[in-house]
Structures are given as structure tokens and as C-alpha cells.
């Protein structure tokens, strides 16, 4: 299961956001390092398409695809040198697929800021610099070990050696490999679990009042201008305190609560989950039956046998064909029987690239 690590400086609202995302009660305190061991929570990735398909057949079960969030303790300047239990926390980040970086864009005198000032750009750069410093040391050590093999003519060692020197020079200039390397180059160094080779999603934690008029939040404007300059997607805005309140309410109470606050169309938390999913180039295909209607996660660009393997390895090994219809065509037809009558169900082979939203029935044979 793919995962996102929620990181940031102490007291930016990470644990509050994590608690809202996973609906778990984790320790939240107004002092650094309230989180030491990473808390982990599994969340459903909501999907309106799946809900609509389920409404056609009323299955025994609806199974959403899932995503793992890890709440990693607040980092501080000097973490790469072990400050604030930094080495332990950085090791936790190496284990996740995506870094979800929470920055503080709200004013609150009751909640201390580790640097005594609200400056999300400065906060962002502190974390990024710590990631760079940690990777710089790791890569330097790796290059030292590879040098003799690379110089002896070992082709694989030389390829990695040359690439790591490029990455190291980039880090010296503050360039992260996730932004500069190709997908094939990133695969070459994947085993190193570089922090700076992981995709980053920026989440701006704002106040309740800010949500009503984000244009007045100077910290947020400064952050987004900086991200735009660095060619990083704009921050997703959330109010972790509102999200925490919402997570404790029943579904039917949530909209009433938001309406009372004047936030009828607010969906910050859902956008964080969806954005994490999309940042990793993840898509969903569906299986459809009376027993269950289910979403399955796959990487954009996977072929039919690879996607079949998400259900069971035997499906991939013995793949023959797949019956496919797009979810919206099936929903419009109201049933598989009607879709078949209209000739909308296609039979595809092993080279077919599954599309986001395909409804699939895999044919396989294992002897």
C-alpha cells in the first residue's frame, strides 16, 4: 500500500490534520515533539464514480481504494545532524512514497511557533534544506563505495556513479532530483530511498476566518508565489481545526456545520487525499458485481495484465482477455446487460492500457 508522510516544523498543525484524516485520536500538544513514534492511519479514497456504480446494483459491499498516512514528528533546523531526534524522524520519511509537507499560514498567539514568526516560505526551506543535507551525506558515502567498482569498468556501478555525481552537484545548488531527473533515472537510484527524490505535496494550514477570504492571507500569497517560482504546484489550503471538528460529526451533520460557518463548498481534507493519490500518478479501475463493487489502485500507464495482478497474482500469470467498459457508459446504461446489448463492452488483450475509471472483468486461466 502506498503511503504519504505528513511532515513539517513543530506546531504547524500536522497531528491535528492527521487526526482528522484518519479519525484517530493522537496526542496533540502545544510543544515540540508531541509525536515521537510515527502514527499510522489507513484512509478510504472517496470516489463518486464508485458510489454511482454501486447505486445501480446495491452490492453487499462497497470497497474503496485505500491510502496510508503517517504522522512524522516535527522536524527542526539541524535534524540532518541529529537535532530534535532528527535522524530518527528522517529515517521515518525514507519509508514513505510521498511527502505531505504542512506549513503554517495562520496567526494564533496561543500556539507558539518554533521560530517565533509566521513565514511559510522560511519554514518550507528549513525542511527542504534538512532533506537535502541528509541526502547529501548519504550520496557522498555511496559515491565513495562505488568509485573503485566504477573505475574498474563495472557498467552498472559506473552508471549509478555518474548519476549520483549529477544529483550531488544539483543538491549543492538546492535542486531536488524529483524535479530534475527523468523517471528512468529516478528508478536507477530508487534503492537509496532519497528524501529529495520523493514527490512533495504542500498543505497550507490556515485559520477558519482565512477560509472565507484566502486573498487576505498574506502568508499564503507569499507561499504560493514562491512555489510558482520554483515550479511546484500551489499549496492545498485546509483548516486543520475545522477538519478535526468535522471528523467527529456524523456525515449528515457535517454539511450543516459547514453551512453555519459559511463554508458550503469547503472540501480541504478530501482534496488533500485526492491530491496525494494524483501526485503519485495513481488511477483506479473498478470491478462490478452483486457481491461487491470495488475500486483498485494502479499506476498510470499499466497494461491489463499488470492491473489484473492487483486483484491476484494468478490473474496476471494466466491473463487471457479483459472485458472493459468506461464507468460513465455503464452508469448511463444502468446495467451490464443493457451495455452488452448496445455493444459497449469491449474485449481487450494484454497490450491494452487500462484507463482511469474503466470497469473490468478479467478472463484468466492458470493450469
Swiss-Prot record:
SUPFAM superfamilies: P-loop containing nucleoside triphosphate hydrolases, TGS-like. Disulfide bonds: none annotated. GO terms for cellular component: cytoplasm. Residues 2-258 form the OBG-type G domain. ATP binds at residues 11-16. Mg(2+) binds at residues 15, 35. HAMAP family: YchF_OLA1_ATPase. This is Ribosome-binding ATPase YchF. It comes from Mycoplasma genitalium (strain ATCC 33530 / DSM 19775 / NCTC 10195 / G37).
Amino acid at each position: 500500500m502506498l503511503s504519504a508522510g505528513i511532515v513539517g516544523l513543530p506546531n504547524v498543525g500536522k497531528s491535528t490534520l492527521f487526526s482528522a484524516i484518519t479519525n484517530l485520536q493522537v496526542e496533540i500538544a502545544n510543544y515540540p515533539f508531541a509525536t515521537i513514534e510515527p502514527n499510522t492511519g489507513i484512509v478510504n479514497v472517496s470516489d463518486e464514480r464508485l458510489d454511482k456504480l454501486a447505486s445501480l446494483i446495491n452490492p453487499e459491499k462497497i470497497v474503496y481504494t485505500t491510502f496510508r498516512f503517517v504522522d512524522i514528528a516535527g522536524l527542526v533546523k539541524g535534524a540532518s545532524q541529529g537535532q530534535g531526534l532528527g535522524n530518527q524522524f528522517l529515517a521515518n520519511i525514507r519509508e514513505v512514497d510521498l511527502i505531505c509537507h504542512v506549513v503554517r499560514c495562520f496567526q494564533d498567539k496561543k500556539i507558539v511557533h518554533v521560530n517565533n514568526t509566521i513565514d511559510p516560505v522560511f519554514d518550507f526551506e528549513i525542511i527542504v534544506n534538512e532533506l537535502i543535507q541528509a541526502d547529501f551525506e548519504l550520496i557522498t558515502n555511496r559515491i565513495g563505495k562505488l568509485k573503485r567498482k566504477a573505475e574498474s569498468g563495472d557498467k552498472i556501478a559506473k552508471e549509478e556513479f555518474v548519476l549520483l555525481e549529477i544529483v550531488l552537484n544539483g543538491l549543492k545548488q538546492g535542486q531536488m532530483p524529483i524535479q530534475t531527473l527523468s523517471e528512468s533515472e529516478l528508478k536507477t537510484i530508487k534503492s537509496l530511498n532519497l528524501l529529495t527524490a520523493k514527490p512533495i505535496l504542500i498543505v497550507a494550514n490556515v485559520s477558519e476566518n482565512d477560509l472565507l477570504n484566502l486573498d487576505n492571507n498574506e502568508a499564503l500569497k507569499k507561499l504560493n508565489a514562491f512555489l510558482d517560482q520554483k515550479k511546484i504546484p500551489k499549496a492545498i489550503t485546509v483548516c486543520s481545526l475545522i477538519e478535526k471538528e468535522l471528523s467527529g460529526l456524523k456525515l449528515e451533520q457535517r454539511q450543516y456545520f459547514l453551512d453555519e460557518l459559511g463554508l458550503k463548498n469547503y472540501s480541504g481534507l478530501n482534496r488533500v487525499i485526492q491530491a496525494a493519490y494524483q501526485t503519485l500518478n495513481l488511477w483506479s479501475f473498478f470491478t462490478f458485481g452483486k457481491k461487491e463493487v470495488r475500486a483498485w489502485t494502479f499506476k498510470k500507464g499499466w497494461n491489463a495484465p499488470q492491473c489484473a495482478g492487483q486483484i491476484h497474482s494468478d490473474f496476471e500469470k494466466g491473463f487471457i482477455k479483459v472485458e472493459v467498459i468506461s464507468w460513465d457508459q455503464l452508469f448511463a446504461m444502468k446495467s451490464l446487460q443493457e451495455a452488452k446489448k448496445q455493444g459497449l463492452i469491449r474485449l481487450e488483450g494484454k497490450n491494452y492500457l487500462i484507463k482511469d475509471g474503466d470497469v473490468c472483468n478479467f478472463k484468466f486461466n492458470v493450469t
